[in-house]
Curated annotation (Swiss-Prot):
Assembly and binders: Interacts with PTPN6/SHP-1 in a tyrosine phosphorylation dependent manner. Interacts with IL4R.
Gene Ontology molecular function: any one: phosphatidylserine binding
Species of the source: Mus musculus (Mouse)
Lineage: Eukaryota, Metazoa, Chordata, Craniata, Vertebrata
Protein name: CMRF35-like molecule 1
Tissue specificity remark: Expressed in myeloid cells. Present on the surface of macrophages (at protein level). Highly expressed by alveolar, splenic macrophages and bone marrow-derived dendritic cells. Expression is increased following aeroallergen challenge in macrophages, mast cells, and eosinophils.
Residue intervals annotated with topology Cytoplasmic: 215-337
Pfam families according to UniProt: SIT, V-set
Post-translational modification: Phosphorylated on tyrosine.
Amino acid sequence: MHLSLLVPFLFWITGCCTAEDPVTGPEEVSGQEQGSLTVQCRYTSGWKDYKKYWCQGVPQRSCKTLVETDASEQLVKKNRVSIRDNQRDFIFTVTMEDLRMSDAGIYWCGITKGGLDPMFKVTVNIGPAIQVPITVPTMPPITSTTTIFTVTTTVKETSMFPTLTSYYSDNGHGGGDSGGGEDGVGDGFLDLSVLLPVISAVLLLLLLVASLFAWRMVRRQKKAAGPPSEQAQSLEGDLCYADLSLKQPRTSPGSSWKKGSSMSSSGKDHQEEVEYVTMAPFPREEVSYAALTLAGLGQEPTYGNTGCPITHVPRTGLEEETTEYSSIRRPLPAAMP
């Protein structure tokens, strides 16, 4: 009878030992400071639709839950820890980023259910960050090369201006013999002493040509202006009109009454007449004087053209030596209506 009770008990013990655990994972994982680590926890197919979580600390029933899924395959992240459930392969993955030395300790992979949750213990180890030596590359020594150039100048006198022809040549490098370099420097100073006088002569010649050109331009402008006498001649063709009033010649006291009576009839008729004289104008407004002689008392007034300068009219024996003066001025132009 005791044996019949012992056999079922042994079968129960064997079944319990061979049964599969609800959740499993790595017992220990390691990471470096300022780095990251990943933990994969497996579960049986019967726990597919349950929530999975990652908690820290001991004992396991009072550990601190860091992150938990929502029974789906969506990624859930909280602070530096994230979790994702792959319900096709029955694996949920936990990732810890920016690791610190204080993150080392005991963690648990767990599944939420009513009562006691199936859990699996994982030990996390954190090592110090690896110091990577910084290598500063050294620059190779810099070697400089000095090149001396010689400029040869040839002056050709086949034209009005000298032609400068320059030849370029390389006499040597700094890496060569020092004696050759000194010869090149001496040739350069020699060519410079020849080149400077040539350039000065060219500049002097250009200055001389410019002065000659300016002198010719001034002379041409003076010729174009012309002498002032031509301008005076151009005014001689103008006509000037002047009003002349004739005065009676002086007579003796005895004959004054006779002449006055004889001229009373003819003098009144011609007193208001106007004398016109064609005069050549002068550039300046000057006063001209004309010597006029009067004929007999019975003669009509005489019209005459007087040119400048006015000459004296010859006198006859019958005429009296009386000279009349008149002021002739050029009239002003009439204003426009």
